[in-house]
Amino acid sequence: VRPGDPVSVGQDIARRGDCGVAIHASVSGRVTAIQDRPHPWGGSSPAILIENDGQNTPCPQRPQPVEAQNVELPLLLERVQAAGIVGMRGEAAPTWEKLARAAGRVDTLIVNAAECEPYVTADYRLLLERSEKILLGASVVARCLGAQRAVIVTEGDKLRAVESLERRLLRRGHSVQLCTVRTRYPLGAEKQIIQTVTGREVPPGGSALDASCVVLNVATLYAVQDALFRGRPLFHRAVTV
């Protein structure tokens, strides 16, 4: 896009140069400038300034939703990259690259919903309010990667979310498993959660792949299923206020 261009909600307006991940407009309106702005991680970064028109006009070129049984690995990677999905636990690494590296190399998909920090409840609300979609997303991603099992991990004191997931697992006969952990920091960290779920240790300097696992934050997984089954790119998320 260029200054003066109109944009709509969900429109692809830029690409991250290092990985090709798409960046989408979160409002509709008009581009007023493209300039460097302060970045939360320090320094500055190129930014697209959009004057919000308040109309929330949706992008007409939204990808068509797909059926779960029709999702294979190439389509999964294509949709995740086009939707601009990155790790939502803080690292912001391209999710399509993470999935591509894991394909055929893992036996376990771990969906990390363990929020060990005080007062943080965004992942808990996702489990409670979107449990069916999270279960579907986990089963589809695990199948595409060739993983034999998918495990959702949350704290044992999240009783309502645990009960909601257990009801759906029993009713639908999902292949997805549920694992509860103690509410103790840093059990939500990747290496600790892998050891808790599988008993395997990630070697020093290694990654989850060395333990035949791939770990996705539950918000990241929810964004993946949104991209597949609603054609919705990543420009929003649940946060704790």
What positions do the PLM features span?
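Short, well-structured beta-strand-loop connectors
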Residues: 2-15, 33
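Small beta-strand-rich domains/subdomains or short beta-sheet motifs embedded
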Residues: 5-6, 22-26
